[in-house]
Amino acid sequence: LLFQLRTRTPHELWLVIVDASASTRRHQALSDAKGLLAQLFDDAYRQRARLALLTASGSVPKWQVQGLKASSGLRVWLDALGAGGGTPLLAALEQAGQWLTVRRKRFPAEQQRLLVVTDGRLKQWSGLPALRCPGLLIDIERGPIRLGRAKDLATELDAQYQHIDELISL
């Protein structure tokens, strides 16, 4: 008898950090981001990727999902997502860095990806955690006066940068 080992490609984990602070309410930024996230969740489901979802709003970041397979249950969360409160994005990035490190030890073959959705409206930051995985920062800042901090944040996170308007026009 011959036994054949199943060859499986390593699982993918998509870590999504969503800035849902009050400033993302302006100019329909969060609404458009929700449409983009709905598409992302559908793609994750089709590709059988695992998702980790961290929301940065209020005073502390909150984990919604940690490493589960994408499912239709995320649609309920997405529909209820609203903007408000402060911007604990830096705390969310810190938590994400710690969580990814632990996860990497537990699942060394897993391919991790990072997506940060933010308007970048932070007062200041220093010493961002090294997340050590490919990343994309989607800038949802809109309006006549743009601070442009999301691009700087992407550079410091060693992530690619894309403005949401460029993605919507595709």
Describe each model-derived feature in a short phrase.
Residues 168-170:
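C-terminal "exit" segments of structured domains
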Residues 13-15, 111-115:
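Structural motif
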Residues 31-54:
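An active-site-proximal "capping" alpha-helix that borders the catalytic cofactor pocket
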Residues 61, 69-112, 121, 139-148:
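Von Willebrand factor
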Residues 120-165:
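VWA/integrin I-like adhesion module and closely mimicked acidic/polar interface patches used
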Residues 20-31, 121-125:
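Short acidic, Gly/Ser-rich segments with clustered Asp/Glu that frequently serve as metal-coordination loops
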Residues 18, 55-57, 116-118, 139-141:
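Short beta-strand/turn micro-motifs composed of small residues
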